C-alpha cells in the first residue's frame, strides 16, 4: 500500500517513518522538506492511502477530497467539527466509496491499555466502582507559541480526546453525561489544565489532563469490588508498570501482581500495521466512537 503524509510536522514525520517502504511522498504548505504544497498537486495514481496530520480546521475538507478520490485515510486524532452530523456523513461517504477512514488514537495500542481491557472484560474485578486517569505533559510553552494550537478548548480536545477514547475502549457502553470539575488557563489563552468526569456512568469516571506537568506522565486507578488495577506511565516515557491487586476479605494486604515494561514506544508501528490490515480487508468505516467523543465534548462545553 502506497501512502502519502499530509502535514509534515512532528506527528507527520513519525507517521512517515512508521510507514517505511509504503511511504512515497509528503504534503505541507510550509515545510521545505515536503514534496508538495497542496494535496491536489499529488498525482492520484501515485498513492492508495493518506496519513493526515493537519490542524483540526483543515481535516474535514481533506477527508472529503480523499474519499471522493477513493483513497484510504488515517486521520490524526481528534476528528472535530461544529456539525455533529458531519461525522455520520463522512462515515456514510466512506462506506459508499468503499474506503477506510480511521481516526488514529495510538494509545489504544499501549501494552498496558490492552492488558487493562482484558482484565476488565474478564470479570475478575467484579463490579467496577471508579476509574480515574491523569494524562499530563509539559508542552504549555510550545502550545502558547503556536497560533493554531493555543485556542478553543486547548488541552480538553488535545489530551482529553485521548482519555475519552481510552474510556470508550475499556467500557463500550459508557454514557455521555460528563461535566467540567475544573478548568484553568494557568499559562495559556486556552485551557491548559482540565478535570472532567461523570458521576452518572458505571463506573464513575474522572479524567484529568494537563500541559503543566513538567515530567510527562500517565496514571490510571481502577477501583472495584474484588480488587483494583493501576497503570503508571507509558512506554514512550518508560518504564511503565501495570499492577493488579486482588482484594483480601474482610481486609488486609492484597495479593499483588506487577508487570513492568521498559521498551521503545510500540504504538505507532502497531497502529500503522492495524490500519494497513483493515484497508487490505476493506473493513467498513466505523466512526461511532468519534461521534461519541465529539458529542461528549460538545455537551461538556455547553454545560449539559
Regions found by a protein language model. Name each.
Residues 49, 60-108:
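Beta-strand-loop-alpha-helix segment that lines the small-molecule cofactor/substrate pocket
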Residues 1-34, 168:
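N-terminal Rossmann-like dinucleotide-binding module
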Residues 164-238, 267-282:
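Contiguous beta-strand/loop segments that form the cofactor/metal-binding neighborhood of enzyme cores
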Amino acid at each position: 500500500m502506497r501512502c502519502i503524509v499530509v502535514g509534515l510536522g512532528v506527528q507527520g514525520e513519525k507517521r512517515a517513518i512508521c510507514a517505511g517502504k509504503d511511504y512515497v511522498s509528503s504534503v505541507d504548505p510550509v515545510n521545505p522538506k515536503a514534496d508538495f504544497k497542496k494535496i491536489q498537486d499529488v498525482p492520484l495514481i501515485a498513492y492508495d492511502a493518506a496519513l493526515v496530520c493537519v490542524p483540526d480546521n483543515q481535516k474535514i475538507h481533506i477527508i472529503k477530497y480523499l474519499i471522493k478520490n477513493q483513497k484510504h485515510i488515517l486521520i490524526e486524532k481528534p476528528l472535530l467539527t461544529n456539525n455533529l452530523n458531519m461525522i455520520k456523513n463522512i462515515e456514510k461517504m466512506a462506506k459508499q466509496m468503499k474506503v477506510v477512514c480511521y481516526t488514529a488514537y495510538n494509545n489504544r495500542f499501549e501494552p498496558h491499555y490492552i492488558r487493562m481491557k482484558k482484565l476488565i472484560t474478564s470479570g475478575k474485578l467484579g463490579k467496577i466502582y471508579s476509574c480515574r486517569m491523569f494524562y499530563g505533559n509539559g508542552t504549555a510553552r510550545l502550545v502558547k507559541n503556536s497560533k493554531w494550537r493555543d485556542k478553543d478548548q486547548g488541552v480538553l480536545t488535545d489530551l482529553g480526546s485521548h482519555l475519552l477514547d481510552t474510556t470508550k475502549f475499556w467500557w463500550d457502553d459508557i454514557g455521555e453525561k460528563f461535566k467540567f470539575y475544573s478548568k484553568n488557563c494557568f499559562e495559556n489563552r486556552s485551557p491548559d489544565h482540565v478535570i472532567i468526569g461523570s458521576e452518572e456512568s458505571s463506573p464513575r469516571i474522572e479524567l484529568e489532563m494537563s500541559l503543566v506537568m513538567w515530567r510527562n506522565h500517565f496514571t490510571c486507578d481502577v477501583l472495584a469490588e474484588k480488587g483494583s488495577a493501576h497503570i503508571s506511565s507509558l512506554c514512550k516515557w518508560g518504564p511503565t508498570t501495570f499492577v493488579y491487586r486482588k482484594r483480601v476479605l474482610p481486609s488486609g494486604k492484597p495479593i499483588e501482581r506487577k508487570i513492568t515494561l521498559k521498551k521503545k514506544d510500540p504504538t505507532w508501528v502497531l497502529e500503522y500495521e492495524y490500519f494497513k490490515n483493515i484497508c487490505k480487508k476493506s473493513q467498513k468505516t466505523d466512526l461511532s466512537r468519534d461521534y461519541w467523543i465529539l458529542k461528549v465534548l460538545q455537551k461538556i462545553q455547553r454545560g449539559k
